[in-house]
Amino acid sequence: MSLTGCLPPRPPCSMRRRTSGGGASVSPVVVMASTAGVGGIGNPTPRGKKPFAPWREVPPQVTHTLPPEKKEVFDSLEGWAADTILPYLKPVEESWQPQDHLPDPRSPSFGDEVAALRERAAGLPDDHLVCLVGDMVTEEALPTYQTMLNTMDGGVRDETGAGGSAWAVWTRAWAAEENRHGDLMNKYLYLTGRVDMRQVEKTIQYLIGSGMDPRTENDPYMGFIYTTFQERATSISHGNTARHAGRHGDAALARVCGTVAADEKRHEAAYAAIVAKLFEVDPDYTVRAFARMMRRKVAMPARLMYDGADDRLFARFAAVAQRLGVYTAADYAGIIEFLVARWGVPGLAAGLSGEGRRAQDFVCSLGPRFRRMEERAQEAAKRAPPAAAAPFSWIHGRQVQL
């Protein structure tokens, strides 16, 4: 899971309690950044003095909104998940490993292979390196994402750390597959000699220490919608990075990014299947959860990215990705439209309450609305002066146009 962010500016979420939804509470924990728009650098709050705290703060977050009776839904789907979702995982012995894509240190030609890798990587522009590093850093924050899945209510979390439920097995095995992504990209970038690995490693440590808040309220309906969206977005991002690498003459890097993108696509299919099943068995609550998730907008998992100096690092990384077409506001709109169609939201009829029908209308309107916003933003960008450049510590402080 990795992503840049490209959403229109959104004011901070205020503290609020729900009057429906099974004992919602407001958490005092400060864990994530407010949304920053692509094309701008954001407006971050200065870093506080607390050690290991996120570098900018947000209001307290709503937690535990899932009605207690909804646990029965996931209990009833345990067998279905074992039969339908676990087969999306690949056996370890049949899975690719990072070493399959890297020079073999046991080989007498190891030095020559590394030299060839470095020669290919020498042609990668700095802005492409920024996107590659940003994606890799996000992949390396995997402990945060597994933790996030295990905060969900409804009986889907891994209660013991080695639980035997299909939901627990999926979470651990999914994380094990995802773990290879950051490993591979990290080692590849190290071998290129093009980036400041100490700065990259600091960024990873800061990001894992800061955590994230996907605004899913510990609700697995919202959580699985969020993960479906993120996996699809990640597949798009890595796929576009692969195409950029190929155009700049690094076919090996293109294969690396393409391999990661294929994994993300498979994981997307699994999470999308879970949500499709929820639409089948509980359409009213599921469409309302979809609308709640989209009203908050999908907060990107690396939004608290920080390298120890640049308070605007994530916004700048996202701006570069938008400019290069690695992940854009148009992609965000396209994902909404795809998921609305994938889950048959326009055709929902039976079983919807008045609130459910309003949620249906809202969700179905989002894709076209975001596309219109993106078109206006593109027109404004054409009339605007060239974007400023900013230094990135990942590439030894060199300037990259935003």
UniProtKB/Swiss-Prot annotation:
Query: Where is the stretch described as Disordered?
Result: 1-25, 38-66
What are the entry keywords?
Chloroplast, Fatty acid biosynthesis, Fatty acid metabolism, Iron, Lipid biosynthesis, Lipid metabolism, Metal-binding, Oxidoreductase, Plastid, Transit peptide
Specify where it is mainly localized: plastid
Report a single Gene Ontology molecular function: metal ion binding
**For binding Fe cation 2, which residues are annotated in this chain's numbering?**
178, 231, 264, 267
- Read off the SUPFAM superfamilies from this record: Ferritin-like (SSF47240)
In the UniProt record, which is one GO cellular component term? chloroplast stroma
Report the top EC class in one word: oxidoreductase
Gene3D superfamilies, per this entry? Answer: Ribonucleotide Reductase, subunit A
What name does this protein carry? Answer: Acyl-[acyl-carrier-protein] desaturase 3, chloroplastic
**UniProt organism field:** Oryza sativa subsp. indica
